[in-house]
Amino acid sequence: MKNRAVRLAALATFASLALPGLATADSTRLELDKLRYVTVYDVAQQAVLAVDTDGRPLTALLRIAKGQFVPPHGAGGPLRVLTIVSGTLSWGDGHTVDEAAERSFGPGSVIVLPAGGGEHWAAARHDDVLLQIVVLRAGKLAPEAAAQLTR
């Protein structure tokens, strides 16, 4: 038993010496202006932060400049979770745009788009907007989040 404990301690020491990058990895703040943005929906800028094993986006940032409107899109997509990072997002559901039916979401707001959901639109009517989009193709919401969904 004592011999086994010595071997485990030696193995742990060797592993910490052999993998110093893993043992001391620091977190990194991304510089958003250094990311590669592409134009989407003709008016917004998207930067992909993470991809799945097939190269499909898992996490992305979406910038919408003040005064820009993203037309209805997104029907039938996977489960998506959007977090407003900055600005006030004007949001509407459906194929027909109705500004009177728009809702406003400020920084820290979270919007859930269910898998297979309908179209929606977005606008930056008051200021620039930055969103983080997380795509959950194989995942699902936690029970407390799922309980808040309305159909």
Where in the sequence are the language-model features?
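Bacterial N-terminal signal peptides that target proteins for export
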Residues: M1-A10
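Bacterial N-terminal signal peptides
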Residues: A9-P20
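A short, N-terminal "cap"/entry segment at the start of jelly-roll beta-barrel domains
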Residues: G21-A60, E102-S104, A146-R151
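Short acidic-glycine-tyrosine-enriched beta hairpin
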Residues: T53-D54, H95-G117
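Conserved short histidine dyad/triad with adjacent acidic residue
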Residues: L58-G77, P114-G116
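Glycine- and acidic-residue-biased ligand/ion/polar-headgroup-sensing regions
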Residues: A65-G67, A75-T96
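Short beta-strand His + acidic residue motifs that chelate non-heme Fe in jelly-roll/DSBH
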Residues: V70-P72, W91-G92, L113, E119-R125
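Ligand-binding loop in jelly-roll beta-barrel domains
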Residues: G106, A115-K140
